[in-house]
Amino acid sequence: MSSGGLLLLLGLLTLWAELTPVSSKDRPHFCHLPADTGPCKARFQAFYYHPVHRKCLEFIYGGCEGNANNFKTIDECKRTCAA
């Protein structure tokens, strides 16, 4: 296979992986962590996955520390955690 064909295949596989929803059994463990504003005092709009409600919700992030269940956009949260 030519390098162009391999590059096309890699691109298609990447697109497929990006568009495939995450099932609950494949959901990363951090999606089950609670929203954590962290100790800093900034006020950034952020999103986290709420496992009981099974959806991404908004929260205010302080700007430092916190945990991995923290996304800049609701779409990023949905792609990562929502099934």
From Swiss-Prot:
Stretch forming the signal peptide: 1-24
InterPro entries (alphabetical): Kunitz_BPTI, Kunitz_BPTI_sf, Prtase_inh_Kunz-CS, TFPI/VKTCI-like
Expression by tissue: Expressed by the venom gland.
Site (Reactive bond for trypsin): K41, A42
Domain BPTI/Kunitz inhibitor: 31-81
Disulfide linkage: C31-C81, C40-C64, C56-C77
Protein localization: Secreted
Gene3D superfamilies with a match to the protein in the record: Pancreatic trypsin inhibitor Kunitz domain (4.10.410.10)
Keywords: Disulfide bond, Protease inhibitor, Secreted, Serine protease inhibitor, Signal
SMART domains: KU (SM00131)
GO CC terms in record: extracellular space
Superkingdom, taxonomy of origin: Eukaryota
The keyword Transmembrane belongs to this UniProt entry's keyword annotation: no
Keyword Lyase attached: no
Main location (coarse class): secreted
GO MF annotation terms: serine-type endopeptidase inhibitor activity
Record-stated family: Belongs to the venom Kunitz-type family.
Function (record text): Serine protease inhibitor.
Name assigned to this protein: Kunitz-type serine protease inhibitor 28
